[in-house]
A protein has these predicted regions:
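An acidic- and aromatic-residue-enriched active-site/binding cleft used to recognize and process polar
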Residues: 203-205, 239, 250
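Conserved structured core elements
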Residues: 75, 151, 228, 241-245
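Active-site-proximal "nucleotidyltransferase
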Residues: 200-206, 210-212
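Conserved small/polar residues in nucleotide/adenosyl-binding loops
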Residues: 252-258
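N-terminal pre-Walker A segment at the start of P-loop NTPase domains
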Residues: 210-239
Length: 260
């Protein structure tokens, strides 16, 4: 592993050279409280952006163990961090100038679903973090503009990392809400079968979406209320008692489109 000063010196050395000189930056660099890894360098400024990752030791990130020891809670925390990091990157994306995709900073943008993603991973034993994202290495035409990349790696990115990947910089209540909600959801999934159910819809849910291409709930929609004959309840670890409609196998069917 090399130091951040070695990366800075390398960038100064290749400045104004032809774009393939950026290939020399591949490798890992110690930035003190995190490691920057340049995993893949794009072939030219108009190609798919370079692949970069940030590695933060659990001892530095300092997330409490109860946020990552259980898989469902860990995935929820990773989802939360990915969204936070994405917002930070969006704030500084294209502040570094150049041709093509120069200055782009982006991470995969999750929908409303909380899923396991390679873009953000946390070790279950120590809480080590890995964030994977894209950077458009700056150029003037097809000539290296290392001064702009230096801004990204030494000014913009450190701010994004410090504001989104360290527990002390985050809203503690929001992080725990995300983890607690995920654990409650997993509790329901784990206890459906013992009640002879395949799905559950909570009372007060908003089921209609605002459009066929949107995941957002419809405004002013009538909240769902379970029919008395299908009501079931669960006592969740964090939210307490919740009531709604339990769906049994006999109520599950597929609706196929009619072919004229």
């Amino acid at each position: 592993m090399q130091s951040q000063n070695e990366l800075r010196n390398l960038l100064q050395r290749i400045d104004h050279k032809s774009y393939p000189a950026y290939k020399d930056t591949r490798g890992s660099y110690d930035f003190g409280n995190y490691v920057l890894s340049i995993d893949h360098v794009q072939g030219d400024p108009f190609a798919a952006p370079s692949k970069v990752s940030v590695h933060v030791r659990g001892g530095a990130a300092k997330f409490p163990a109860d946020l990552y020891r259980m898989k469902c809670r860990r995935l929820a925390v990773c989802d939360y961090l990915l969204r936070q990091f994405g917002r930070e990157l969006e704030r500084v994306s294209f502040k570094a100038k150049g041709s093509g995709k120069s200055g782009l900073l982006a991470v995969s943008r999750p929908g409303q679903e909380v899923l396991e993603r390679t873009a953000c991973q946390m070790d279950e034993a120590k809480g080590d973090l890995v964030l994977r994202f894209e950077v458009g290495f700056p150029a003037n035409g097809r000539t290296v503009n290392a001064r702009e990349l230096e801004k990204i790696f030494f000014t913009f990115l450190p701010e994004c990392v410090l504001h989104s990947l360290f527990y002390k910089a985050l809203d503690e209540k929001a992080v725990y809400r995300a983890a607690d909600l995920a654990e409650d959801q997993q509790y329901i999934r784990d206890h459906l079968k013992e009640q002879g159910l395949v799905a559950f819809v909570a009372d007060a849910s908003i089921l209609p979406r605002e459009s066929g291409v949107s995941g957002r709930p419809m405004k002013d929609a009538v909240k769902f209320t379970a029919p008395e004959s299908m009501k079931v309840s669960f006592v969740l670890p964090h939210a307490g008692k919740i009531q709604g409609m339990g769906i049994t196998v006999s109520y599950t069917h597929l609706t196929l489109p009619t072919i004229a």
